[in-house]
Amino acid sequence: MADETDVLPKALHEQILREQILTAQDFINSTAQQQPKAIILGGQPGAGKGGLVAQAKAELDQNAVTIDPDELRRHHPRVADFRRENPYEWSGRTHKDASSWADELRVAATAEKKNLIFDTTLSDGKWASETLIKGLQEQGYEVEVRAVASPKLESEHGVDERFTANTDRQGYGRHVPEGARDAIYGKLPVSLDTIHANSNVPIRIFNREGIELYDSRADARMPGQALEEARNARLKDPAFTEHLREAWQKQVDWHRDLPDHVQEIPKSDPDVQAKLLEEHAKLRVSDVVASRMEGIATIDELGGQVLHLHACLCRNLKSQACVAPG
């Protein structure tokens, strides 16, 4: 819903880059490297890339510039107004400037041969392989791609829980449009395969807890296949699906009760509260959350039935009586 009036004048955009972004501790404390490294992170919104960021920074001894367009949104001088005017849709109004700052920060960091951690969705494998990765390699960077394998019901919960928790804690959250979430989720496996075909960089896949599940240097599978299999495997773990079902129930409760507790949101006033309820209804958030709850409940119940049948089959080795799950 952004329009041209939301985009900063060129001079102000560049001033903020010089005076705020390029003077941040993350940038100025990172030193030039003889053999700089770039770790490109991929995953749909809510997948849990934050854990991979921390892991990558630790591997690089905290000596790296982290590039995350979402973190750069806060530098927009009108961001507080946007959050008040559009509690759900404000991030779109900062998108153009934040994306440009991310590109400009990358250019500045690579010019000084600083290590990079690039937090992205990796939804465009062609651009990533032919422009981003190739450009970094031409500048002497050792490049690696790391992706998070998170099933859609998990990442969707991550997006929604982040929004509600931050709204309760600080008065605002960052929502990601449903269409964007759906598109990115579907594109990631294809993007990984495109990168694998068009470049020689290692591709590694991790789960949300940071455990490595795949390394293209040692696994004959295509990364897209490995990602899909890892996503699906997560939903076959009954302990995981039970936990996710309980987590989604909390989200259902939050959205159902929003009209009753909206006045408790910090740093808000009646105008902001009314706008939050208006956008919440317009985007049919409660319906979306309810559908996710229904999805994980079905998977969780099926998983329980499979476990029951498996136990029965095992017992049948000793006794022939087994009651099918009702």
Range-by-range predicted roles:
Residues 49:
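Conserved lysine of the Walker
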